Structures are given as structure tokens and as C-alpha cells.
Amino acid sequence: MELLDRVGLKDKADQYPGRCSGGQQQRVAIARSLSLDPMVMLFDEPTSALDPEVGAEILAVMRELADDGMTMMVVTHEMGFAKKIADSVVFLHKGRVHESGTPDAIFSAPQTQELKDFLSALHQAGRL
């Protein structure tokens, strides 16, 4: 019950996950993972299929995990989120690592043209 409360779903304790919304299912998955007391949690595009409001809820849960010291490896296009919570960022393009470093280095002084183009597109779209 404590873990469901931690992800904001204490009121859903008697429901099957399949009866929950997509965002709620994501949070149930996080609670299930936390029940194993992991050293590291892996996330693969945790907000990609969610509307922005629900995606923000997932990011808030992940931010709390980071604040509590959870090590996470996150594959994401949510660059604003990565910039705020990451200790290190790895930029991949077409299956190849193009750059890695601190968020400040990656976002303030990109070295490769691919990363420069990616960040420029995000800025133009208002997503960073």
C-alpha cells in the first residue's frame, strides 16, 4: 500500500492494472519495480504514449525517485527533464553514441553537428 501511495495510486489498490489508464499503469509498474528494492531502475520512453498532463505525472514520480537517490537509466526525448535530473547524459543518433557528458556540457556546449541539430529543433519547437 505504501508503494501505491508513493506513486499516487493508493485509491486504486483494489483495481486490476488492466482497468487503469495508461499513466496509472505506468505508475503501477513503477510501484511493482520498487517492491523489489532495486539498485537501478530502467525506463524506456516512459512518457511517449501518454498525453502531456499524464506524462508530467510520470515525470513527477521519477523526479521524486531521483530526489530519493534512486539510480535510473532513462531513454527519453524529454530533454528538459533529462537536463534537470540527470547526472550524465548520453546522446545517441542512429544507434551510435555521438556525445556523453554532464547535462551542462551536453546542453550548453554540444560538440557534434547531430546534437546541435537536435537541440536546435527542440528549441524551435519550444520543447527545451
List each model region and its residues.
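Conserved signature/switch motifs of ABC ATPase nucleotide-binding domains
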Residues: 15-18, 36, 68
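Catalytic Walker B motif of ABC-type/P-loop ATPase nucleotide-binding domains
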Residues: 41-44
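Helix N-cap at the start of a conserved alpha-helix in ABC-type nucleotide-binding domains
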Residues: 52-54
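H-loop/switch region of ABC-family ATPase nucleotide-binding domains
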Residues: 76-77
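A short, surface-exposed alpha-helical micro-motif characterized by mixed small hydrophobic
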Residues: 82-84
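ABC ATPase "signature
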Residues: 100-101
